[in-house]
From Swiss-Prot:
UniProt PTM: 4'-phosphopantetheine is transferred from CoA to a specific serine of apo-ACP by AcpS. This modification is essential for activity because fatty acids are bound in thioester linkage to the sulfhydryl of the prosthetic group.
This protein's UniProt keywords: Cytoplasm, Fatty acid biosynthesis, Fatty acid metabolism, Lipid biosynthesis, Lipid metabolism, Phosphopantetheine, Phosphoprotein
Keyword Transcription: no
Gene giving rise to this polypeptide: acpP
Main subcellular location: cytoplasm
Places the protein is found: Cytoplasm
Ranges where the Carrier domain occurs: 2-77
GO cellular component terms, A-Z: cytosol; membrane
Stated role: Carrier of the growing fatty acid chain in fatty acid biosynthesis.
Pathway entry: Lipid metabolism; fatty acid biosynthesis
Listed name of the protein: Acyl carrier protein
Organism: Gemmatimonas aurantiaca (strain DSM 14586 / JCM 11422 / NBRC 100505 / T-27)
Amino acid sequence: MADHASKIKDIIEKELGVEREKLTPEASFIEDLGADSLDIVELVMEFEKEFNIDIPDEDAEKLRTVGDAVAYLEAKVGG
């Protein structure tokens, strides 16, 4: 659902301080958006807070791109 994708991108944009245009599905958090491991932890915490879900560490490790995050969160929250 576009609404979830928009919220996810809002969180990424705010947490990483990157322009929205860079938030393509294939954009890697680390290689393309300049995130480090702490940034990833903070992103996951914000996703959990925004969507009121728990993201296990083993799932969080699989969230490498914007598209990964959107697909995972939409599946998790029924989007």
